[in-house]
Amino acid sequence: MEDRRSKSDEQFVAHFREKYDARLPVWALTELMELGQLSILYRGLRQQDAEEIARAFGAPTKRIMASWLASLNYVRNVAAHHARLFNRKLQHAPARPKTGQVPVLDHLRDVETPKGVFGTYSALAVIAHILPSIDPETDWHRRLVELLRAFPASPALSVSSIGVPHSWESLDLWR
């Protein structure tokens, strides 16, 4: 973090360097952190603070939110390195909340196949659930549905390769 802080050309970092000492307040420090670092920081938070953050993003517990962050960090890294994500088995699949904790994600518990549990779909479902807490006007979920509908039909590779459940498009999460 020291290296990122010292090399940062962000205006708020320069302001703190000039006006105060080298120690950045936590809100400024988190702006410089990578997603993986934020995930680690989150796991180290006090239970009460972590649960407040989890609730803000629609996660029922600190454990679930920590799992989601680790999974999204993994997905982000795969995508950033231009690796195949489509039908990949996720090494860090997002934890599935207990039935009733997050009703729009209850369908994730109905699946026990490796594709259903560890497929890319589970991460996409978590993203679709979290995004409205960041941007209530998001239409990302609708655009994803359209993108997957446009996927070419092929016996060798289909949308089911990512672990989508039967009739997934009719789920409330995607409407």
Placement of each model-derived feature along the sequence:
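Long, contiguous internal "core" modules enriched in hydrophobic/ aromatic residues
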Residues: 1-175
